[in-house]
């Protein structure tokens, strides 16, 4: 287990006042000491997780300097997303008695007894990038339905509302894939001039998408767009290899994919959409609000990252080759998103600004 921990700063505690002024938010009457924070991450084995940790450590360092928290530590479990290893990690973290425990879990259920122990100790527990049925835990997450809605609508708009599309599906039988496919097909059914000419499972992976499309592309008519879940780079490469016109696609917002797109690969109107590695930061600020006495919904939805054609070059400047684009959440932006959750306006809430580096 790798644990990095910053020293504790002495700071006067300040109430964190939400920008959302609504009668459903109750604020604590007494000032509290700035909280200590621990983050438990199930594994560190891909670019999304590494980007999530980087974003969290940057935001937590600033939050500590601003006196919003007194200290933080990040613990990444060894291995490949093992619930057993994360449970051992969590038990070690609980010995430090943090005020806030943020968890990117290996399982939505296996950690529950250990997380219940944290709740019983009075620790604010927030799960992100996943879910849990543990009633004492808060959930901060992106909606897979929103991801599917935003990327599918972008492809529909990109092809002018008419033409042939292929649906590149995710991990067969998984709950996210089922949810995303339902949204995709519903949107497509509302656009009768868009015809689905093929479906294939690509596991949201560029290499698998390239292989699957190359094996079927000869049998397909002209394809104007590929509706999917971030495998756009592989889809474009398949059409390039086959000598076909390039379709409108949904890329993953990695630095490499964005640069590939920026070099003219992919038809105009393409987009990049993915769940936000900044969810850990959003969970941090939401948990600070809870710690300071605010009442928020048990589950709060935050937007996925959306990179449009006109914003692509700004994102390229902000994202390293091996990083995944993420929103740079602040306390104020999180408060606005919490207000949108309370008011039922999540789908129409304004997105954060494009990061500047």
What are these model-derived regions, one by one?
Residues 5-13:
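Sec-dependent N-terminal signal peptides
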Residues 2-4, 26-357:
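A residue-level marker of the well-folded mature domains of exported/periplasmic proteins
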Residues 16-25, 253:
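C-terminal segment of classical bacterial N-terminal signal peptides
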